[in-house]
Curated annotation (Swiss-Prot):
Cofactor(s) the protein needs: K(+)
Gene Ontology CC terms, in alphabetical order: cytoplasm; cytosol
Gene: mnmE
Enzyme class: hydrolase
Domain TrmE-type G: 222-386
PANTHER family: TRNA MODIFICATION GTPASE GTPBP3, TRNA MODIFICATION GTPASE GTPBP3, MITOCHONDRIAL
Chain positions recorded as Mg(2+) binding sites: 236, 257
UniProt-recorded name of the protein: tRNA modification GTPase MnmE
UniProt xrefs under Gene3D superfamilies: P-loop containing nucleotide triphosphate hydrolases (3.40.50.300), Probable tRNA modification gtpase trme, domain 1 (3.30.1360.120), tRNA modification GTPase MnmE domain 2 (1.20.120.430)
Length: 465
């Protein structure tokens, strides 16, 4: 994304929907002059060096007339973008916001491109590239887990270790190159043994970082919950109660559900995808329903393999729903490693008052009819979500996708540098690999970048950010 970095840019920075407050944002070296030409800044105010706020009247011409605006001004480079910046706060009406933006453009600003404010912050050194991507992660976060990850990345928890690793690698490279400069002198700036150890430590750090990025990049913030069990175990009714919908067909006839039924829900700030599956059963080949049942079982098995939580439903009035599984491990045999199993005894309302499901080895007893135990099941699901979020140390998905190749290259160059050192192939080759590793790490944090990289990162932003 090539940009005239000295231009004063302007954009609407709030949603174009009715709201008590809307924002028009400006940034650029002529920002103060633009505000003066808009007549929302006095000459005396324009000469100040400290950030300030002032209530003004902005004339928008006929038929809109004049409106009251609050003007927030950062008159020096000590702003988000590293340039003089300002915001006009006014009533969040789309026509008023657009007319205010038009007034700024008539006064000498130009319309900002997507992500241009954050790109200027990056170019000014206020943010590195991973932090800039985290801004978009905060904007796009759909639940608390992804928001926490984006905020962590914005705080520098991803870039700081990488910048430290790059700095350490530069120091090591300086020692190696100093040794080359004084090759005829009896001076050892760093021994091969120490160099190998330090390079291997850096390689391990990058491997760990790449693994975290891989985990986050391939994972969805939405937790997949699959409802399983024998036919007529109450799965569909439980799905409807949990989602407060009538998405699944409920009848007393076993085997009603054949296709997967998927519903989105949210509890405790976390997003969940609930999946109702066909009951686990086997049919004789002579049974005309066998092909349909087999296909339904394949769909259920596929859903189970990708699920984070398996809710195994046992009909409390039947009693053998869990025994038929032989052991809890059988349920998770083909599930992903981090999956959790919750055994739920359904139809609690049809059992005696003092019955709690322990005889069936159930974790919970619920009644979709009365709602008993449903809140406890939701609490278990939210608890799982919080534990998963606490254990994640990854990045926003955009960063994970962008950085994989660069980190892989850095790891490969460090491995090659270690190999050249072990084989005494010459410090010229070692230094060359180390320089390539430094460059690859710089591509992650943005110390090394091209216009194509900036296009890819900031082109995903909306205008005004």
């Amino acid at each position: 994304m090539t940009s005239e970095a000295d231009d004063t840019i302007a954009a609407i920075a709030s949603p174009m929907t009715p709201a008590p407050r809307g924002i028009v944002r400006l940034s650029g070296h002529d920002c103060i002059d633009v505000l003066c030409r808009m007549k929302v800044l006095d000459t005396d105010e324009a000469s100040g060096r400290r950030p300030f706020r002032s209530s003004k009247t902005l004339s928008l011409g006929e038929p809109l007339g004049a409106i009251e605006v609050d003007v927030m001004v950062w008159p020096t480079q000590r702003s988000y973008t590293g340039q003089p910046s300002a915001e006009l706060h006014l009533i969040g009406s789309a026509p008023l916001l657009q007319s205010s933006l038009d007034a700024a453009i008539r006064a000498g600003a130009r319309a900002a491109r997507p992500g241009e404010f954050t790109m200027r912050s990056f170019l000014a050194g206020r943010l590195d590239l991973t932090q800039a991507e985290a801004v978009l992660g905060v904007i796009e976060a759909e639940d608390r887990g992804t928001l926490d990850q984006a905020l962590s990345q914005l705080a520098g928890n991803l870039s700081r270790p990488l910048q430290a690793a790059r700095s350490t690698l530069l120091d090591l490279l300086a020692d190696v190159e100093a040794g080359l400069d004084f090759v005829d002198e009896d001076i050892e700036f760093i021994s091969d043994e120490a160099l190998i150890q330090r390079l291997d430590e850096l390689r391990s750090l990058l491997l760990q970082t790449r693994s975290q990025l891989s985990d986050r990049g391939g994972a969805s913030s939405t937790i997949r919950v699959v409802l399983r069990g024998l036919p007529n175990a109450g799965k569909s009714r439980l799905l409807n109660v949990l989602s407060r919908t009538e998405s699944a067909i409920v009848t007393d006839q076993a085997g009603t559900t054949r296709d997967l039924v998927t519903v989105e829900s949210s509890w405790g700030g976390h997003s969940f995808q609930l999946i109702d599956t066909a009951g686990s059963e086997s049919r004789e080949e002579s049974d005309p329903e066998a092909p349909i049942s087999q296909e339904a079982q394949l769909q259920a098995a596929e859903a189970a393999r990708g699920a984070d939580v398996h809710v195994w439903c046992i009909d409390a009035t039947g009693g053998d729903g869990f025994e038929s599984l032989k052991s809890p491990n059988a349920v998770l045999a083909e599930a992903k490693r981090s999956a959790q199993l919750i055994c739920v005894a359904t139809k609690r309302d049809l059992m005696p008052t003092d019955w709690n499901g322990e005889s069936m080895r159930a974790d919970l007893a619920v009644s979709s009819e009365s709602g008993t135990g449903v809140d406890s099941l939701i609490e278990r699901l939210v608890q799982f979500a919080e534990q998963r979020d606490a254990g994640e140390t990854g990045s926003v998905i955009g960063t994970a996708a962008r950085c994989q190749d660069s980190l892989a290259a850095a790891i490969e160059h460090l491995a090659q540098a270690i190999q050249w050192t072990e084989q005494a192939a010459g410090h010229e080759l070692v230094a060359a690999e180390m320089r390539l590793a430094v460059e690859a790490i710089g591509e992650v944090t943005g110390q090394v970048y091209t216009d194509d990289i900036l296009d890819r990162v900031f082109g995903r932003f909306c205008i005004g950010k």
